[in-house]
Amino acid sequence: SGNFKIHRFNSSATFAVNDGGSAGGSNTVEYLVVAGGGGGGGQIGGGGGGGGFRTGNLSVSAQNYSITVGGGGSRGVGGSTPGNPGSQGGTSTFSNISSAGGGSGAGFSQGIPASNGGAGGSGGGGVATSNNTASGGAGNTPSTSPSQGNNGGGSSPTRASGSAPIAASVGGGAGAAGTNTNTANGNNTGGAGAASSILGSSFTFSGGGGGGALGTATASSGGSGGGG
């Protein structure tokens, strides 16, 4: 684009730098490294966290740089009690820049006090299942500066153990944390993703996933930028 060349990698590959910049040029590249999102939990599960989002500038020299593109995490298995959590998304890397996969969404587990969301680039959503509050998974794990993501949403217990309605919480996104979900009502939205214009136009990446629901509760939708 203009004096710039855009390289986009949707799968793992090698970025080959053949020559350094001229005396009047630059040896710096702008990068955006996005990890895979976390899988949602099974059996009225919490939303998966958005994949880690890291952007900045990096000096390069004439050599090959390995690119790893992390895939999305697997969903938790439903139709059973306890429901299984999803799995963490895959890590994406460029040179020494690493973005962590999104945290797993919690699975619903009747008879267990609470199921917390998993940690990751952004954290997964939790599910409260009795008189205890579930926590969202920690975002920006491992810690980076600037932060690669935000926490997942927690879930507050507002019903008797094991009774409907039940609603799970949402995953965090690169642009905003997942907000806590009222277990009896649901109807929340996953954490918003973060925008980047590195591809020439503005796109949003790494939104948090929505949470499931049962009975009269309303399932939560995913956040902008990829949350499902």
Per-region residue spans from a language model:
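Glycine-biased low-complexity/repetitive sequence motifs
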Residues: S1-G228
